[in-house]
Swiss-Prot record:
The active site is at residues 182, 467. This is Malate synthase, glyoxysomal. It is found in: Glyoxysome. It comes from Cucurbita maxima (Pumpkin). Transmembrane segments: none annotated. A motif (Microbody targeting signal) lies at residues 564-566. The lineage of its organism: Eukaryota, Viridiplantae, Streptophyta, Embryophyta, Tracheophyta.
Amino acid sequence: MGSLGMYSESAVRKKSSRGYDVPEGVDIRGRYDEEFARILNKEALLFVADLQRTFRNHIRYSMECRREAKRRYNEGAVPGFDPATKYIRESEWTCASVPPAVADRRVEITGPVERKMIINALNSGAKVFMADFEDALSPNWENLMRGQINLKDAVDGTISFHDKARNKVYKLNDQTAKLFVRPRGWHFAEAHIFIDGEPATGCLVDFGLYFFHNHANFRRSQGQGSGPFFYLPKMEHSREAKIWNSVFERAEKMAGIERGSIRATVLIETLPAVFQMDEILYELRDHSVGLNCGRWDYIFSYVKTFQAHLDRLLPDRVQVGMAQHFMRSYSDLLIRTCHTVVCHVGGMAAQIPIRDDPKANEMALELVRKDKLREAKAGHDGTWAAHPGLIPACMEVFTNSMGNAPNQIRSARRDDAANLTEDDLLQQPRGVRTLEGLRLNTRVGIQYLAAWLTGTGSVPLYNLMEDAATAEISRVQNWQWLKYGVELDGDGLGVRVNKELFARVVEEEMERIEREVGKEKFRKGMYKEACKMFTRQCTAPTLDDFLTLDAYNHIVIHHPRELSRL
């Protein structure tokens, strides 16, 4: 990235006593490793530091705006369309044309930035692989740095993995999926890298290191002259999209590549963002390749946004599917918004194959087919799959629905969704609240968190591939039911959720987890630590914004200067 020569030589030459060569004001507090040092070279760190210094005040202001919005919602306000940006929603404009490299996104596979996962996903037959630094990754130092190494090797085409247990070597096929990378959200700090005495912003570290090392090779090998490509999570307002757009423009300028080269799909996975979709696309119009329904996080956000609204309690989370009016309205408006301004839209399937039960596996695949057929008929251009085994079924549905067309951008404009109102998007979901719902939330939340604390962020549980979104839904729903003493339906009829009932549920579900995973795995794992953390979060007087921020404090390891090379 030759244009970084604009910085002074003295700024680049400072050496860290932890072993890394760092620019002025940068301190690496993670373990020293020679492989990591190739990623964390002084020019790459200078690039990340420049992004941090340029945009930190904008990020800080955006987070203050989030806190102010939360205060208003907790006092009784509800999200809605902004009258001040009505002109954007009602005027005619379009996003930049979709690059040929990503015109066809019928099926996308997602997963963490682990070496074997990257190879298998790129070889899976999907059109796109979203490599995840966010909800599918436990962001300890090793995972983050290995992830950057793995992605660099993947872009270079040199990645391989030797599975010693199976004596099998994994390498890339000639034809691979297009690579997208999802950095963390704006709210997540990177506690192993300090810039000017403050933790760096996690997403700027993820984006900055990946872009710095890979933009040139990516454009040659994957992007057909465009890219790199990204997914952007957890945004709540268009001002946050505006920061991303400015980050992209600065990165393009410093790399000496054409403006609009970087492209990103935004996940609409927070309730406030559904009222900002036009505005988000408008801010990113030169860098956008669409929106995606991040529906699990969207349900989490619904509960979090309405945490103080007794009249908006959710039923059991398994009942909050796309058939619920507020979820269907969200999906329909997202499709209309994207196709009006000529860009992509996608969805998600979390099921995984059930290898030891062919009948159950076929039932699961049939559920996937029905879900994907609904998405295709609604106008989605593609969908996510959490496992390679789902790709043929998903691909078949979208190919049959779209024929030879790579997408439905111009054929499924969804003008019928033009009259969707704020009430449609906020309508309370219907269903029952049961003791089994409380049990499932508790059992899944504890098991996911136990895996996360030991370095695994994508966890197969009960035939679904779960990431942090599931644990978040489980936590906030338990918290809300406890706060308001919800009366249970079904077998728990007349029973109210209180701390005594919850304590009994936790004890019984821990016994069940031990039976299911086995005594040895239970003893060696972090189930007890996860149980304490999950229980504390569910019974806290105030609701934390993110479970992962609390859990992150338990996986951060700062290495003393004198031990950094050990």
